[in-house]
Amino acid sequence: MFEGVFPALITPFQRNHGKNLDLDGLRSNIAHLVAAGVHGVVPCGSTGESATLSFAEHEQVVEVTMDEAGGKVPVLAGTGSNNTSEALRFTRAAKDVGADGVLVISPYYNKPNRSGLIKHYTAIADLDIPVVVYNVPGRTGQNITPDIIAELAKHPNIVGVKEASGDLGQISTIIELTRDEDFAVISGDDNLTLPILSLGGKGVISVAANIYPRPLIEMYEAAQKGDYETAREIHFKYSPLFRAMFYESNPIPVKKAAEILGMAAGPLRLPLDEASEQTTERLKEVLSRYD
């Protein structure tokens, strides 16, 4: 179910005092992505500024995403927290509105031990909804090692991992250890998507696909056909864009790029701030290559 190109959706905000949700803008962005042919969407992830959404806003974003994309493409809702009871609450809410699955970041700051991690994910998976583990040690301060992923993959509801460690050796080991399970290893880094696909990965949860979905889709489709020459050409053409998405902390650059391209984006919520003037000019230069 969770294979292909899944944009990690930005959450548009209004440029008012409260920086309220721009739900019409969210709908417009989702409709554009679905029409472009994405294989699924991910609301309320890191790119969606989930850390600064209230519980009610989190519910609203998932509900609107389901209303706009549900039945057209799978919706994988971000429901992670460093508090297991809160992650369970987010997950129940996503399940109640019909999300196809949930993306659950590993608990950040707490640094749980092995048994704590396994119990955390097991409690969420026991809610009887497909769970994709999200490993991003650069944000959480802790790496989920391949042996832990392999153990989690034995749970029938833990169906994949979004791997954003940046370590191809580790990712290769995870694919090796989970080959006998119905388990998807998904890239969490646009620039590593092609190498991960070549190892047997199943797709990407993408930042860049918010603004340029078609190249990612075409690269994925070429790789699926074994046409790695075409896939490499696309990869190298868009690598500058992939790198540009991290000129500053995600999602600062992608929201600015979306704004430049006329999409709904709006401001960021503190502690994230607007892209610097230098970043904005660098983004404009990179985007101009793809006009």
Curated annotation (Swiss-Prot):
Site: Part of a proton relay during catalysis. Where? Answer: 46, 109
User: Under which pathway is this protein filed?
Assistant: Amino-acid biosynthesis; L-lysine biosynthesis via DAP pathway; (S)-tetrahydrodipicolinate from L-aspartate: step 3/4
One record GO biological process:
diaminopimelate biosynthetic process
Superkingdom, natural source:
Archaea
Please report the name of this protein according to its UniProt entry.
4-hydroxy-tetrahydrodipicolinate synthase
Keywords recorded for this protein, A-Z? Amino-acid biosynthesis, Cytoplasm, Diaminopimelate biosynthesis, Lyase, Lysine biosynthesis, Schiff base
As for family, the record states: Belongs to the DapA family.
Taxonomic path: Archaea, Methanobacteriati, Methanobacteriota, Stenosarchaea group, Methanomicrobia
Q: Mind telling me which SUPFAM superfamilies this protein's record contains?
A: Aldolase
Instruction: Please name the source species.
Output: Methanospirillum hungatei JF-1 (strain ATCC 27890 / DSM 864 / NBRC 100397 / JF-1)
Q: How does it assemble?
A: Homotetramer; dimer of dimers.
**Alphabetized InterPro entries for the sequence:** Aldolase_TIM, DapA, DapA-like, Schiff_base-form_aldolases_AS, Schiff_base-form_aldolases_CS
Catalytic activity entry = L-aspartate 4-semialdehyde + pyruvate = (2S,4S)-4-hydroxy-2,3,4,5-tetrahydrodipicolinate + H2O + H(+)
